[in-house]
Curated annotation (Swiss-Prot):
Keywords: Carbohydrate metabolism, Cellulose degradation, Copper, Disulfide bond, Metal-binding, Monooxygenase, Oxidoreductase, Polysaccharide degradation, Secreted, Signal. Lignocellulose is the most abundant polymeric composite on Earth and is a recalcitrant but promising renewable substrate for industrial biotechnology applications. Together with cellobiose dehydrogenases (CDHs) an enzymatic system capable of oxidative cellulose cleavage is formed, which increases the efficiency of cellulases and put LPMOs at focus of biofuel research. Residues 1-17 form the signal peptide. Binds 1 copper ion per subunit. It comes from Neurospora crassa (strain ATCC 24698 / 74-OR23-1A / CBS 708.71 / DSM 1257 / FGSC 987). The gene is gh61-6. Disulfide bonds join C59-C177, C147-C231. This is AA9 family lytic polysaccharide monooxygenase F. Belongs to the polysaccharide monooxygenase AA9 family. One of its GO terms (molecular function) is metal ion binding. Gene3D superfamilies: 2.70.50.70.
Amino acid sequence: MLPSISLLLAAALGTSAHYTFPKVWANSGTTADWQYVRRADNWQNNGFVDNVNSQQIRCFQSTHSPAQSTLSVAAGTTITYGAAPSVYHPGPMQFYLARVPDGQDINSWTGEGAVWFKIYHEQPTFGSQLTWSSNGKSSFPVKIPSCIKSGSYLLRAEHIGLHVAQSSGAAQFYISCAQLSITGGGSTEPGANYKVSFPGAYKASDPGILININYPVPTSYKNPGPSVFTC
């Protein structure tokens, strides 16, 4: 039996409503998909992670695979992470960094352990509904802290779709990790209170993950994960 037109349309809309984070660039230049970003498992289907205890919650990779290249950026500068086609769902954009230990190769390092510190999270605008500035956008500037040590880092981009998050396990995580070489840094190492592991940073019951954003409309929002590290 041939599938109905309505089923085909639903499938097409479902795919188009999802997205990836395949590129990162500095200055005004653009880069190829997955050039500096580790190719995520959703590179073909634009899917999402819904299990916060899965290994995919780290960089959306079931099997480790490095990026083609590592992007060199100066500490204190702003770079841009790109979505494809664009963020479609309401929810926060968040960014984490993890420094590759001295003596290890960024291409083989997986980012395991309590090494991730948050450098940005998005708060909504409150009113008759929650409004997220990331919704509908395809590029996201993120500033590299000026005080952190120079070295090799993974930059983890994460958008959490909260449109159906009133049920446990229904929040949608869109994730990828870029490879950076940060130069001209300072001497600061974020403290243990800022660092988390993936998996381990989130619980499915966290108030910023298990939440009904539609009714009653929340008057506050607590981002999942640690506090944002600042210099």
